[in-house]
From Swiss-Prot:
Name of the protein in its database record: Glutamate 5-kinase
UniProt-listed PANTHER family: GLUTAMATE 5-KINASE, ISOPENTENYL PHOSPHATE KINASE
EC numbers, comma separated: 2.7.2.11
Pathway: Amino-acid biosynthesis; L-proline biosynthesis; L-glutamate 5-semialdehyde from L-glutamate: step 1/2
This protein's encoding gene: proB
Lineage: Bacteria, Bacillati, Bacillota, Bacilli, Lactobacillales
Positions bound to ATP: 9, 168-169, 210-216
Binding locations of substrate: 49, 136, 148
Biological process, per Gene Ontology: L-proline biosynthetic process
GO cellular component, one term: cytosol
Matches recorded under InterPro entries: AceGlu_kinase-like_sf (IPR036393), Asp/Glu/Uridylate_kinase (IPR001048), G5K_ProB (IPR041739), Glu/AcGlu_kinase (IPR001057), Glu_5kinase (IPR011529), Glu_5kinase/COase_Synthase (IPR005715), Glutamate_5-kinase_CS (IPR019797), PUA (IPR002478)
The keyword Transmembrane is assigned to this record: no
Length: 358
């Protein structure tokens, strides 16, 4: 028996028929595999799209809506239908499921972030399968960008999962879009996610979903930097989920970073709300990135936005305007501005223990 934690993300295209509506056969196939893995001792979390697909026809629309308000309304109807489908299927195998709706705010707020972590840990300990979705009825931006890829990475990182599996309608990452370029080559393993990878990623997904390969790369970047390996594969095979656990099927495996961030630094890097920024000189960049030092107020050359003590701000290199990291500040923007204006900037702005390089 194993107690490994696996987070599966299933996209809309893996759950729907050609007309965009929910496919019960596909859902049954997924839940059957989840049940088999559950019985083997795996701790399973499912991050699922599909609430809009489940609800738009019940609401009277002939095809999947494109307007934000209509999507929100469809999601409000469909979320209950979607979770009911999962719940009934899992109950056939005696498995309890739990619905959790999240938004980015649940990760941006440190207390809610911890609460979400604790609730998920209890559910897994009690052998339930959490079924998680973006709260599409209120999360406007998430509906626009199909951010359940990112959500699944955040959940996997939060739980320190052993593997994140992103199921989609393609069998991994290619050097070009395989649907339009016959020379596209499949990439079975990725050690480091670079800008070149983002450049080659095909950005368009299927019309039923809202996320393409670019969002999956962004998700993989979050997870791998948090110490969680990621496997992207197709959901079309009947046993895709079962095979994905050991990467027996064709896909792309993203290896976990050797120097994974701890949970506190993960929160600063990926989730904390940042409404302000500072620009620092070359000496400060070198001290923070290469010498492990704190950011002194003397290194700050410009600031943007207002911040109070304890808030997380972005830090940019003045030379090339590159984002180099984020950190909690020990001075307010007002105090820092006053110091800079009087030519007497002093003390630590961001301590190295409250800093994460990006």
């Amino acid at each position: 028996m194993t107690e490994k934690t696996i987070v599966f993300k299933v996209g809309t295209s893996s759950l729907t028929q050609e007309n965009g509506s929910l496919d019960r056969i596909k859902i049954a196939r997924i839940t059957n595999q989840l049940a088999q893995l559950h019985q083997k001792g795996y701790q399973i979390v499912l991050v699922t799209s599909g609430s809009i697909a489940a609800g738009f026809r019940r609401l009277g629309f002939d095809k999947r809506p494109t307007k934000i308000a209509e999507k929100q309304a469809s999601a409000a109807v469909g979320q209950g239908l979607l979770i009911e489908e999962y719940t009934q299927n899992l109950m056939k195998d005696g498995i309890v499921s739990a619905q959790i709706l999240l938004t980015q705010d649940d990760f941006a707020d440190a207390r809610r972030y911890q609460n979400a972590s604790q609730a998920l840990q209890v559910l897994l300990k009690q052998r339930a399968i959490p079924i998680i979705n973006e709260n599409d009825t209120i999360a406007i931006e998430e509906i626009k960008v199909g951010d359940n890829d990112t959500l699944s990475a955040q959940v996997a990182s939060l739980l320190k999962a052993d593997l994140l599996v992103l199921l989609t309608d393609v069998d991994g990452l290619y050097t070009a879009n395989p649907n339009s370029d016959p020379t596209a080559q499949h990439l079975p393993q990725i050690k480091e996610i670079t800008e070149d990878l983002f450049a080659m990623a095909a950005g368009a997904g299927s019309s039923n979903g809202t996320g393409g390969m670019t969002t999956k790369l962004q998700a993989a970047q979050i997870a791998t930097k948090s110490g969680v390996p990621v496997f992207i594969c197709s959901s079309k095979e009947d046993t895709a989920l079962l095979q994905a656990v050991t990467q027996a099927n064709r896909g792309t495996l993203f290896l976990a970073d050797d120097h994974a961030m701890n949970q506190r630094k993960q929160w600063m890097a990926f989730y904390a709300r940042t409404d302000a920024a500072v620009e620092v000189d070359a000496g400060a960049v070198d001290a923070m990135l290469h010498q492990g030092r704190s950011l002194l107020a003397t290194g700050v050359k410009a600031l943007e936005g207002d911040f109070e003590v304890g808030q997380v701000v972005e830090v940019y290199s003045q030379a090339d305007h590159r984002l180099i990291g984020k950190g909690r500040v020990k001075l307010s923007s007002k105090d820092l501005q006053d110091q800079l204006a009087n030519g007497r900037a002093e003390g630590v702005l961001i301590h190295r223990n409250d800093w994460v390089s990006l």
